[in-house]
């Protein structure tokens, strides 16, 4: 298998490819690392 695409979350890479015989490059990570929880700000 080949490399996967870019990760959906910032700072995280992608997974492996699912199609045999096809080599793919790994995707780049996102922007700054963000925590799962977010503080509630006044909108």
Curated annotation (Swiss-Prot):
Region feature (Disordered): 1-43
A GO cellular-component term linked to this record: extracellular region
Record's function text: Responsible for plasticity of the cell wall. Might play a role in wound healing and plant disease resistance.
Feature: compositional bias, Basic residues: 31-43
Domain of life: Eukaryota
Similarity comment: Belongs to the GRP family.
Keyword Secreted: yes
Name this protein carries in UniProt: Glycine-rich cell wall structural protein
Cell compartments where the protein resides: Secreted, Cell wall
Keyword Secreted appears in the UniProt entry: yes
This protein's UniProt keywords: Antimicrobial, Cell wall, Fungicide, Secreted
Biased composition (Gly residues): 1-30
Organism of this sequence: Elymus repens (Quackgrass)
A Gene Ontology BP annotation from the UniProt entry: killing of cells of another organism
